[in-house]
């Protein structure tokens, strides 16, 4: 790597002499003109005043792209101001630069990217725009879809994950309720994502720990690097990295899948969500059946990432096991419990009660005591193992795990798109502009 260059963003709301004065003091190598004409006659006036190369375009992101391609930029200094650069545009700029590993500095802010990790095994990175949007369900779906053609390992990084990377051989063993209770009684979080993925995908998983998440989605602390080495020791043909909440693995994978909830609406244009959107080769919009016009969120996504393959989906309950007799449904929210109950009843299952309090152990215990049932249908989340499953086993109840299968509502085929992404990655390493 050569000399690390510094670029400045300047505008026409400042007099050209003021811009030149600031650029000389900060020892800037080149600049991008971002708009504003109040203090200048034309952009030529600015060019004549400056002693460095100036880039400009009606689309400031095209100008930035060109400057970055022609120079080894490692730092961008924002010398503009409102009204030229609004907070929304500045967050878009931050997203644009962080994706490329470039630091973005303003008068009272600094966005510094975590270093992207490159690995020598083909990989897909699944990232999300928040918690409870169905990211783990998508991770399991991707895992079981790809295992039809490849040896797959899923690497997770949860807030309840193990300090040392932990392997669960979902490809070699059955994940039973008894096994999970045994894990829980040893003081481990048996509902962590790597257990859930091993259960729902039937592949080997590596569970890692992370703590803290930044605005862009990078973690403060994690054991991901060790997890990568453990995953590679399993000799996978493809590794799937699965994010945690709105945070994600800082691995520069050949393919990215971004998971967005349709319920988030315009929120995805705010702050640094555009970074996550811009990374996606595939963008899976979950819960699209719960909004009146899911096409609106597709339009928002296209504004940020016009090249993405967008899939509008709904979740359909996928039961792992057979239901017998009267059933009770236990999930992480009352709304999801109601939706699942209705769909299962439509399938002929006799649901006599439900709870959406997996994340509230006290309420969950109280609710389960009030209902008489034969089969517990439960998500592997939060208090599932140490409360719901343990109680059901003590009472001799049958336990069926509840997963969610994404179903397209837009006449597209998510399964085939996931396979096609993997084929591109495995066959040609998925290289593309911006990676």
UniProtKB/Swiss-Prot annotation:
Q: What class of enzyme is it?
A: ligase
Q: Subcellular location, in the record's words? A: Cytoplasm
What are the protein's GO molecular function terms? ATP binding; cyclic 2,3-diphosphoglycerate synthetase activity; ligase activity
Tell me the disulfide pairings in this chain: none
Query: What reaction is this protein's catalytic activity?
Result: (2R)-2,3-bisphosphoglycerate + ATP + H(+) = cyclic (2R)-2,3-bisphosphoglycerate + ADP + phosphate
Signal peptide (residue range) = none
Give the UniProt keywords, A-Z. ATP-binding, Cytoplasm, Ligase, Nucleotide-binding
Q: What is its EC number?
A: 6.5.1.9
Q: What does this protein do?
A: Catalyzes the formation of cyclic 2,3-diphosphoglycerate (cDPG) by formation of an intramolecular phosphoanhydride bond at the expense of ATP.
Family membership, please give it.
Belongs to the cyclic 2,3-diphosphoglycerate synthetase family.
Q: What is this protein called?
A: Cyclic 2,3-diphosphoglycerate synthetase
